[in-house]
């Protein structure tokens, strides 16, 4: 959900250095930003941040004269880590961590989509401030990244999802937020194509070119509950049985229980277990349609431009739905019917055939 904010900073001339979970390294490889894995102990985390700051100072003499660190996390520990490393931080004020922030930002007074919250908190880095800590104003670098803006008034978009409304953050007016966009590496695409070959989903044409056959990706896995209700749509097995006669269905479970569930509950699907995250993203991008719960792969599918049918139950869609130009949101209490989802899947498949 942070991708719109990261690209916004990139387009404002920032040379990003990202620090986060290990899985972010392969996932963001196509963005060309250095990604550093956050260590486990306080000493190691502070050492990493100090080292990054030291390296950046050799390239940027004004690094210490302005805000230089954006905290997209809400944790107390992330603010403490950055403060101990001597960084000038901007982040949301909460849980007593405002004392450690150079520029604490007040929490939004109204609920916002998480992507919009990230977008708003980065505002001080992309607009001048009167206290001498102005963000850099270098011209944005040339970029091949598309800049597709969702509607800024919160009305439903043509694909059935709702775009977040731009809201005024403290001391600046947030510009319209871009869609999340995740580019893929050539290596990830090649690895995905190899897996599709192995699954019989690539056809050689008369002119020697390879053609990927239409397939659907189902993401029936969702961990945890919300207000005591499962976030996993119970209609996935039935949907899979109805789709298999029409086109191949691909499942990409994680290790352990998910793999067992995939092979037990979806015997007619083609299961690829343990797929690396960047290759997973490429397989989603090549699909005719993706059907997902409220789960990370749903957001991933939207970010790589896949046609996503997002099936939600108890999730607060206004805050956590997947965003993208090809996202169709289906939500009903307690859950949508299989026929309703299948109808939207057919529409997505028809749109894929037209391209």
Where in this protein do the model-derived segments appear?
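Catalytic machinery of carbohydrate-active enzymes
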Residues: 1-355
């Amino acid at each position: 959900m942070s991708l719109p904010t990261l690209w916004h900073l990139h387009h404002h001339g920032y040379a990003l250095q990202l620090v986060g979970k290990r899985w972010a390294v392969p996932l963001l490889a196509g963005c060309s930003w250095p990604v550093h894995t956050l260590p486990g102990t306080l000493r190691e985390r502070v050492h990493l941040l100090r080292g990054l700051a030291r390296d950046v100072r050799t390239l940027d003499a004004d690094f210490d004269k302005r805000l230089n660190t954006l905290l997209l996390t809400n944790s107390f520990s992330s603010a403490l880590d950055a403060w101990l490393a001597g960084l000038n931080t901007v982040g949301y004020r909460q849980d007593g961590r405002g004392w450690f922030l150079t520029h604490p930002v007040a929490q939004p007074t109204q609920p916002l989509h998480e992507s919009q919250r990230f977008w708003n908190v980065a505002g001080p880095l992309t607009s001048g401030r009167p206290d001498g800590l102005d963000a850099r104003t270098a011209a944005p670098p040339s970029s091949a990244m598309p800049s597709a803006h969702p509607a800024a008034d919160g009305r439903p978009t043509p694909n059935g999802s709702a775009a977040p409304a731009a809201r005024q953050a403290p001391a600046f007016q947030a510009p319209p937020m871009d869609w999340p966009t995740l580019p893929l590496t050539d290596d990830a695409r090649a690895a995905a194509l190899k897996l599709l070959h192995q699954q019989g989903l690539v056809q050689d044409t008369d002119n020697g070119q390879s053609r990927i056959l239409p397939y659907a990706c189902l993401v029936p896995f969702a961990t945890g509950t919300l207000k005591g209700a499962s976030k996993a749509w119970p209609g996935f097995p039935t949907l899979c049985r109805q789709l298999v006669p029409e086109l191949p269905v691909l499942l990409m479970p994680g290790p352990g229980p998910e793999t067992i569930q995939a092979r037990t509950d979806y015997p007619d699907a083609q299961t690829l277990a343990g797929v690396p995250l960047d290759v997973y993203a490429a397989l989603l991008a090549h699909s005719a349609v993706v059907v997902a719960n409220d789960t990370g792969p749903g957001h991933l599918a939207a970010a790589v431009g896949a046609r996503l049918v997002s099936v939600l139950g108890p999730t607060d869609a206004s805050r956590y739905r997947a965003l993208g130009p090809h996202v169709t949101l289906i939500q009903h209490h307690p859950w949508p019917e299989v026929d309703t989802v299948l109808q939207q899947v057919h529409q997505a498949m028809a749109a894929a055939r037209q391209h």
